[in-house]
Amino acid sequence: MSITNNMESPSDSEVRLTLNDRALWTKFCSLTNEMIVTKSGRRMFPVLKLTASGLEPNSMYSFLLDFAPADSNRWKYVNGEWVPGGKPEPHAASCVYVHPDSPNFGSHWMKQPVSFNKVKLTNKGNGGGQQIMLNSLHKYEPRIHVVKVGGEAASERTIATFSFPESQFIAVTAYQNEEVTSLKIKHNPFAKAFLDAKERPDQTDFHSLAGIPVSSPQVPSWYGRNGSTSSARHFTHCNSYGGESELTSVQDTAIPSYTSRNCMRNSYRGNARATPYTIPHKELTCQATSFPEPVPNDGFYPMFPNSELLPRTTLNNYSPAMGAYTNSSIVTSSDIQSGNNNNFFYSNNNNINTTDEVPTTYMTNDFNSFYNQSSNSGMPGTTYLPYQSSPVNQFYSYQPPYSTEIADISPTQQDIINAQNPYQTAWTPPLSYDGCSTMYNSITPYSSSGESTTSEMTLLATARYLQNLRL
């Protein structure tokens, strides 16, 4: 450490600055340290931190930083080492960086290390503010000036200037020495994204998963500015706090990547996914509902309700579930069941015993809708009447007072025509499959002679009896 004192009082001779992280700076110095300079400015690593002592606690001080040329050479990197490469460029007057805490009391500077972590190095002029312009491929040495503010003359004066030889570096636009690159990646917290994929346990080799060989490089090696080559690939890196940290690189030559002199906000190409992410989803399933299904025009029914994708079967095997028809609405009758064991009906019960349950005739108060509705069940001999959304609705199975031979009579198209014109000769009301006469209101059939026949009166009485049961 070199000190230049401009002492005017005995207390000024006691001012001392100690370089923090001296061991780390020494490692970089042994490898010839490199610092990145860019147009927009790049922060230093290692960060220049110092511990102050010997300041007057109640006096005001300012801390300033500038960079002085360490020699009169221009440098180049050849065959893995830095060698002088010609005369230097004219050195412009170096800008001075003023610490943002300046001016402040001596007690403030001594209670914690003085850190110059916000200074940026640039290779373009007129940076101003936090930027200091340096010439690329030139060696520099940082200098810290301690300025005392105030006093009797109310002026500023520099009381001491400190420099540290182990902090010397060569300004570069891209790292040349791989060992310097590795050391910065290892110690710089903002360069962890550029660690070798083999050294990071949380990395996944997506190239091997996709069957892509990683041994063959996909980009040419980097060529230096002076014609020298380097197998390292060079990157710049932006930290997540808005500022920019050290330029870092990747050692693993097996993973291809691009070279860049600009700030890369993404990690190297080897970390890219070879295959896109999969989107988890639920498999859509077809669910049956409890609503009746319209009758297909081709005379066949699907095996399950509301599913046109499944195979169809004939009417004899069709038994879908319908919420409107429950077991509570079925009245068993062993006498009627003797002629109807082969019939099927709608039910919500999966375990149907056809030996005890019988099909049902469904009743309505609307006579016209009775004849205008087509059979939704599609079964021969069964007439479907629209379901009335009323709490009074109940469905019954009724055993008629006449023989089962009449119960086997099915309504025909002529029966329906006759029912629509009840005053014609030899009118016979249509019958359901189980022998129950179809319900109607305010219809009194007469024969051509004007008197009701015995058969017609029997059917009329049966119809009225079933209406009373419904009410």
From Swiss-Prot:
GO molecular function: DNA-binding transcription factor activity, RNA polymerase II-specific; RNA polymerase II cis-regulatory region sequence-specific DNA binding
CDD domains in alphabetical order: T-box_TBXT_TBX19-like (cd20192)
Subcellular location: Nucleus
Superkingdom: Eukaryota
Cited SMART domains: TBOX
Tissue: Developing notochord.
InterPro entries, alphabetized: p53-like_TF_DNA-bd_sf, T-box_DNA-bd, T-box_sf, TF_Brachyury, TF_T-box, TF_T-box_CS
Alphabetized UniProt keyword annotations: Activator, Developmental protein, DNA-binding, Nucleus, Transcription, Transcription regulation
A Pfam short name: T-box
Known function: Involved in the transcriptional regulation of genes required for mesoderm differentiation.
Name the UniProt record assigns to this protein: T-box transcription factor T
UniProt organism field: Halocynthia roretzi (Sea squirt)
